[in-house]
């Protein structure tokens, strides 16, 4: 069940049109914040998640945070960023670069190098920007 949920979230995030260095990145922020806010822990502790505005950012982007308090005095911090690779690198497949399933289907008819062909055939990789 966890694996399926992780795959679902990944596909949903890949599907968000959010080019780097645009206000469109806020769509990913909105998604991530809602994802946290919908979790039972954060419903019970809403003060422990939110958005922190990036100072002087011309696109008014934010950093999303969530703090899960435990019983230990130790703290574990997970950090990341959510900008994306441009879809332009997909060339003729740019129109499906944010649709994981459609991209894999279209890639079947594209000439790829040997390694990429093997990776595509394996079914072990998720493709998309």
State the predicted function of each range.
Residues 74-129:
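Active-site metal-coordination/substrate-binding segment of hydrolases
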Residues 13, 25, 49-51, 84, ...:
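Generic hydrophobic, helix-prone segments enriched in Leu/Val/Ile
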Residues 10, 28-32, 77-85:
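Long, contiguous hydrophobic alpha-helical segments, chiefly transmembrane helices and signal peptides
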Residues 1-26, 30:
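N-terminal capping segment at the start of a domain
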Residues 19-73, 89-100, 125:
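A non-catalytic alpha/beta surface segment that caps or lines the substrate-entry region
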